[in-house]
């Protein structure tokens, strides 16, 4: 691992990064999205799922496509799809300890809502360890990897991208960050949409476990 002494800030994507069981949580969100689309557009669940998937791949979030093509109220959408059961998530003491011992500014950087991110980190028992959250509303609904999203995030957090490390499970979302000088970290996964572009040079590190990686950073910076 290269020298990371210049790193002062760390960005965490939320879903799929702060917890491992993506299906248990985001699987619920996905089903709620399908139901929302079916209800709003008066289509069957199969057609709704097709639109959801198509918009996600074309516009980086299903919400973005729904706003463009169907003038969906984003706040109504976010409130509905994030009303889920998080009892499947347990407190993560290992992650908590590593976050506590890592002397860096810590931020959540998500394409979801602030409320959803707050619910996740509260369920994990790490809600008091983050300096701030940047969500899709802060991004004016420009989803990652839209350059506007990154510009707005940097302005809100008032951080230097060259002093920042960013952990993400969707590889393509790291591309713009790398151009800005951010140290990029891809959390390895087998989701097709997650690993697309994972072979590109804009990824500095590929990791299998967030807590272990944070421990490595801590040990490196204290050496």
Locations of the language-model features?
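Generic anion/oxyanion-binding catalytic loop in active/binding sites
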Residues: 22, 37, 55, 106, ...
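Catalytic-core regions built around general acid/base machinery
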Residues: 94-103
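Proline-centered loop/turn at the N-terminus of a beta-strand
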Residues: 105-107, 183
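N-terminal helical cap/lid subdomain that shapes the substrate entry/recognition surface
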Residues: 3-94, 115
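Asp-based, Mg2+/Mn2+-dependent phosphohydrolase catalytic module
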Residues: 1-7, 100, 114, 118-223
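Conserved phosphate-coupling serine/threonine residues in phosphotransfer and NTP-handling enzymes
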Residues: 110-112
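Secondary-structure boundary/capping signal
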Residues: 44-45, 74, 106, 128-130, ...
């Amino acid at each position: 691992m290269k020298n990371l002494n210049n790193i002062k800030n760390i960005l965490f994507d939320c879903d799929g990064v702060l917890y491992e069981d993506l299906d248990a949580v985001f699987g619920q969100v996905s089903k709620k999205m399908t139901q929302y689309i079916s209800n709003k557009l008066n289509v069957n669940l199969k057609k709704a799922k097709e639109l959801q998937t198509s918009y996600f791949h074309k516009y980086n979030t299903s919400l973005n496509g729904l706003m463009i093509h169907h003038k969906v109220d984003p706040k109504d959408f976010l409130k509905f799809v994030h009303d889920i059961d998080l009892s499947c998530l347990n407190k993560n003491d290992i992650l908590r300890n590593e976050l506590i011992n890592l002397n860096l500014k810590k931020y959540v950087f998500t394409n979801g809502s602030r409320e959803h991110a707050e619910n996740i980190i509260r369920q994990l028992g790490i809600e008091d360890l983050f300096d701030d959250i940047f969500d899709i509303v802060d991004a004016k609904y420009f989803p990652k990897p839209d350059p506007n999203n990154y510009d707005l995030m940097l302005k809100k957090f008032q951080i230097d991208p060259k002093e920042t490390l960013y952990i993400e499970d969707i590889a393509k979302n790291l591309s713009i960050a790398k151009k800005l000088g951010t140290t990029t970290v891809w959390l390895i996964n087998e989701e097709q949409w997650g690993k697309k572009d994972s072979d590109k040079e804009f990824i500095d590190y590929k990791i299998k476990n967030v807590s272990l990686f944070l421990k490595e950073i801590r040990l490196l910076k204290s050496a």
